[in-house]
UniProtKB/Swiss-Prot annotation:
Keyword Ribosomal protein appears in the UniProt entry: no
Compartments in which it is found: Cytoplasm
CDD domains membership: EPSP_synthase
Organism field: Bifidobacterium longum (strain DJO10A)
PROSITE patterns according to UniProt: EPSP_SYNTHASE_1, EPSP_SYNTHASE_2
Catalysed reactions, semicolon-separated: 3-phosphoshikimate + phosphoenolpyruvate = 5-O-(1-carboxyvinyl)-3-phosphoshikimate + phosphate
GO terms classed as biological process: amino acid biosynthetic process; aromatic amino acid family biosynthetic process; chorismate biosynthetic process
The UniProt record lists the keyword Amino-acid biosynthesis: yes
Name assigned to this protein: 3-phosphoshikimate 1-carboxyvinyltransferase
Length: 445
């Protein structure tokens, strides 16, 4: 074990079929995009239903270091008013701490282009392994200077803004194969460039394209003008003064709904999540369809004017054969937990980029599935999970690798496998500050 065997959390078994309603906090992806866009405007913006977790708190801390005010409502900490710097320029000669948050380390560096001095970036030691170079290469193409204080292309580093930004349309080419966040980080700030931006992705595949579409929709919603040519892998953004509406409500995090809705397939019974949007740019919006393919009954009832996603399972799980998860790789750990109990093998493909997430998620999933007696192996672009007899599965102390989705993965296995203990379940605070309470509450209902 690479983590200390302290504060082990015994994952609770599901003693009976579930019948639970679980309210999921706001979307991390949308919360951190809205925070960036609010900071790039000229007027205060109140964000309602903002996720409060380590990642969003790190984002607010980063913005405050740059001179942005983030005022938390005294009545509810999920309402935050963001006020950009009065001068219209971000503070330089400051330190930004990114923790292990990919959205912070890849979205905030772009703001340094508009700072009045150098900005230093650092993070958790584990963050030093996360790739950063494409977005930083993009900023260098825009005239910034990047000084690395460790390995090139990784934290820690200092960004010095250029004396002047390009007056003509900027031409930037990067290989974003490792993460869609490299493209999103540049698109978020592109409208503020004097001549706008023409951004080209030079890699063969574009990972997590729905996340890029989310960014495009959010930039457009703030007044930006983006022309996307996904087949050519290019995005052209006009220079515009962007401003979010004075009040913006954040959708629930549909990817964080995956462990709870997926629990209905593993344990049997029904789980409902309220405030499910009719349309969404979140990749987690694909989840209900995936669960249906695995054998769940899925419906979207409206109760008291609120739209729910309702998932019912009977404890049986259909394997999926070859299954392309390119569009929603972040829910791969939750789907993997369900597929451990499937009737046939599944090859989840299109998710090679998960090797560069909080941990190497493909390697971690294989390790932990094998740890409980399951059968799994890495593929060049994904993961194979094969069925095993139920009696082969057994309890274990499970690693989480400081990765929130590996912790929720372990909890899902614990619904059906006795004696699962989870190391550092507190890592779920990255996106679900009360995961343990929510999970226990689901089982008590």
């Amino acid at each position: 074990m690479t983590e200390r065997l302290t504060n082990l959390w015994p994952a609770p078994l599901a003693a009976q079929p579930l019948n639970a309603t679980v309210t999921v906090p706001g979307s991390k992806s949308l919360s951190n995009r809205y925070l960036i866009l609010a900071a790039l405007g000229s007027k205060p913006v109140t964000l309602i239903g903002l996720l409060r977790s380590r990642d969003t708190d790190l984002m607010m801390g980063a913005l405050e270091a740059l001179g942005v005010r983030c005022d938390v409502d005294s009545a509810t900490d999920t309402t935050v008013t963001v006020t950009p710097p009065v001068s219209g320029r971000f503070h330089g000669n400051v330190n930004v701490f990114c923790g292990l948050a990919g959205t912070v380390m890849r979205f905030v560096p772009g703001l340094a282009l508009f700072a009045d001095g150098p900005v230093n970036f650092d993070g958790d030691e584990q963050a030093y392994a996360r790739p950063m170079k494409p977005v930083l290469d993009g900023l260098e193409q825009l005239g910034a200077t990047v000084d690395y204080h460790g390995e090139v292309g990784r934290l820690p580093f200092t960004i010095t803004p250029p004396a002047t930004l390009p007056a003509a349309q900027a031409q930037v080419s990067i290989d974003s194969s490792g993460s869609s966040q490299f493209i999103s980080g540049l698109l978020l700030i592109s409208s503020k460039l004097p001549g706008g931006l023409h951004l080209a992705h030079t890699g063969e595949k574009t990972p997590s394209l729905p996340h890029i579409r989310m960014t495009v929709a959010d930039v457009t919603g703030a007044g930006g003008a983006v022309e996307a040519d996904e087949s050519a892998r290019t995005w052209t953004v006009e220079p515009r003064a962007m401003q979010l509406s004075s009040k913006v409500t954040v959708e629930p995090d549909l990817s964080n709904a995956a462990p709870f809705l997926g629990a209905a397939l593993i344990a049997g019974g029904t789980v409902r999540v309220p405030h499910w949007p009719e349309t969404t740019t979140q990749p987690g919006g694909l989840l209900p369809g995936y669960l249906e393919q695995m054998g769940a009954e899925v419906s979207f009832p409206t109760i008291g004017g609120v739209r729910y996603c309702e998932v019912t399972g009977d404890g049986t799980v259909r394997g999926l054969g070859t299954f392309d998860l390119t569009a929603a790789g972040e829910i791969a750990p939750s789907l993997a937990a369900i597929l451990v109990f499937a009737d046939k093998s599944t090859d989840m493909v299109g998710i090679g980029h998960l090797r560069g997430h909080e941990t190497n998620r493909l390697e971690a999933l294989v390790n932990e599935i094998r740890r409980v007696g399951g059968a799994a192996e890495e593929l060049p672009d994904g993961l194979r999970i094969e069925p095993v007899p139920a009696e082969t599965l057994h309890g274990a102390v499970m690693e989480t690798y400081a990765d929130h989705r590996m912790a929720t993965f372990a909890a899902m296995l614990g619904l059906r496998i006795p004696d699962i203990e989870v190391i550092n379940v507190a890592t779920t605070r990255k996106t679900l500050p009360d995961f343990v309470g929510m999970w226990s509450g689901m089982l008590r209902q």
